[in-house]
């Protein structure tokens, strides 16, 4: 059944009333585009069965910075995630982040598994490992070496591109660009 509506807690209640609780809820490359994440989390919590899981895939901000994936940063993406804030966000909504898989999609993403608080799954070691790495990188500090280096590498890319375009113009060549 396809429901032509935006997902929220009210829709989740209707789904549960008609079909029962869900053992699996998925969302791929959408979570970062949602304005009201709290409402989505409330809906997911209402929809999940006691042993159910919510699996979503989204950009991983650490990979974005380390891999220079700034071309994916644009207006549709309202959030860029790291693991610690995700853990706190789901805890606030009575859920727990129990597993994370790093995947190469879109320059570096994470596939996260969330369950209701106290659910049957044990927390995978990778969750704590990624949180420890984020803390070591000082990802929450805009003046951390990670971001200073990121800024420097972006400026270097700008210099290289500007130089290349000047060289091409000097050779009488024309350049064209297109973007979405």
Language-model features, listed with the residues they occupy:
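Short, glycine-/aromatic-enriched active-site segment of Class I SAM-dependent methyltransferases
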Residues: 56-79, 83-85
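A short, well-structured juxtamembrane/interface segment
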Residues: 153-171
């Amino acid at each position: 059944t396809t429901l032509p509506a935006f997902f929220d807690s009210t829709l989740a209640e209707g789904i549960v009333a008609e079909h029962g609780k869900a053992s699996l809820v998925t969302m791929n490359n959408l979570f970062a585009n949602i304005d009201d994440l709290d409402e989505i989390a409330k809906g997911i919590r209402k929809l999940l069965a006691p042993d159910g899981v919510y699996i979503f895939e989204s950009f991983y901000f650490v990979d974005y910075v380390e891999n220079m994936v700034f071309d994916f940063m644009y207006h549709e993406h309202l959030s860029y995630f790291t693991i610690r804030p995700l853990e706190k966000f789901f805890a606030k909504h009575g859920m727990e982040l129990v597993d994370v898989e790093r995947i190469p999609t879109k320059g570096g993403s994470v596939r996260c598994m969330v369950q209701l608080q106290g659910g049957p799954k044990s927390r995978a070691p990778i969750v704590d490992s990624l949180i420890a790495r984020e803390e070591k990188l000082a990802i929450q500090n805009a003046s951390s070496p990670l971001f200073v280096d990121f800024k420097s590498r972006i400026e270097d890319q700008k210099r290289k591109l500007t130089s290349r375009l000047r060289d091409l113009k000097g050779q009488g060549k024309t350049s064209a660009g297109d973007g979405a």
